[in-house]
Amino acid sequence: MRILGIETSCDETGVAIYDDEKGLLAHQLYSQVKLHADYGGVVPELASRDHVKKTIPLIQAALNDAGMTKDDIDGIAYTAGPGLVGALLVGSTIGRSIAYAWDVPAIPVHHMEGHLLAPMLEDNPPEFPFVALLVSGGHTLMVEVKGIGDYQILGESVDDAAGEAFDKTAKLMGLDYPGGPRLSKLAEAGVKGRFKFPRPMTDRPGLDFSFSGLKTFAANTIRANDDDEQTRADIAFAFQEAVADTLAIKCRRALKQTGMKRLVMAGGVSANTYLRQELEAMMKKIGGEVFYPRTEFCTDNGAMIAYAGMQRLKNGETTDLAVQAKPRWPIDQLAPIK
């Protein structure tokens, strides 16, 4: 079975083809970073228009890479949500239309389930059950995962997501878009211990997150200190350290609460090297394992959507002719795969 996956939930256009026997056959990705850079963030209308231009050519490129035609495809998986409504409508309309034209099933996929299952594309995938930390620009979720679709949300951000806090703090420091990776790069030159940032919501029980106060603390620290390069690097280091420590503390709590020893981290922020090192050290101490996708599959991509769609189609899940786009869609509303 071969599934073509389409991802257009935000500012990346991703298309991939996944074979249930041979694995990933093709992977095409176009990033809109340059398009949005002048605005300091994603402009939804521009994102939607660019998806319109790029999706069909990327589908053809993926077919060419795999040496296939439309007749070799058994289903179309597309991101139905959550995400920017206009961007979602582009991918879902194209996906649903192509499925109708090619006479194959269409499978709407939850964007965060795609991220959660992205480590399954690796040579050493995690076994169920596990705890998943989903960290991106729009979401920070702690999820107990007993199987595909069998999800219980243990904690989530009550305000800014971790990736959003990275981007906003980077903007406060005058760093160009996309700010998160640039802040992490600046932090590499930082000195540990010069600044001490709080670890929000770690002084109380629970697994929810809050990063808006950390952003405010960063703003006050920036205003109170010199603007030389070393000071900027030290502030960036302290901020990144605080986010990583907070996530690690919450992960350890979640693992203790569930009695699990396997941790999956996915989403755009999971590409952060410092965060990976923190979680690896924490899991080593407790005798557990941590899994995450390769860097190119941490950010939005079509491969994770094709894989998730494959699992849903095998479970007999398809849709009628209606185009599905759900800007808000809690992951624990998904049906478990039997």
Swiss-Prot record:
Fe cation binds at residues 111, 115, 300. Binds 1 Fe(2+) ion per subunit. InterPro entries: ATPase_NBD, Gcp-like_dom, KAE1/TsaD, Peptidase_M22_CS, TsaD. Substrate binds at residues 134-138, 167, 180, 272. It comes from the Bacteria. It is found in: Cytoplasm. The keyword tRNA processing applies. It catalyses: L-threonylcarbamoyladenylate + adenosine(37) in tRNA = N(6)-L-threonylcarbamoyladenosine(37) in tRNA + AMP + H(+). Keywords: Acyltransferase, Cytoplasm, Iron, Metal-binding, Transferase, tRNA processing. One of its GO terms (biological process) is tRNA threonylcarbamoyladenosine modification. Pfam families: TsaD. Its EC number is 2.3.1.234. The keyword Cell cycle does not apply. GO terms for molecular function: iron ion binding; N(6)-L-threonylcarbamoyladenine synthase activity. GO terms for cellular component: cytoplasm. Gene3D superfamilies: 3.30.420.40. Its cofactor is Fe(2+). Required for the formation of a threonylcarbamoyl group on adenosine at position 37 (t(6)A37) in tRNAs that read codons beginning with adenine. Is involved in the transfer of the threonylcarbamoyl moiety of threonylcarbamoyl-AMP (TC-AMP) to the N6 group of A37, together with TsaE and TsaB. TsaD likely plays a direct catalytic role in this reaction. Belongs to the KAE1 / TsaD family. PANTHER family: TRNA N6-ADENOSINE THREONYLCARBAMOYLTRANSFERASE, TRNA N6-ADENOSINE THREONYLCARBAMOYLTRANSFERASE, MITOCHONDRIAL. This is tRNA N6-adenosine threonylcarbamoyltransferase. It comes from Aliivibrio salmonicida (strain LFI1238) (Vibrio salmonicida (strain LFI1238)). The gene is tsaD.
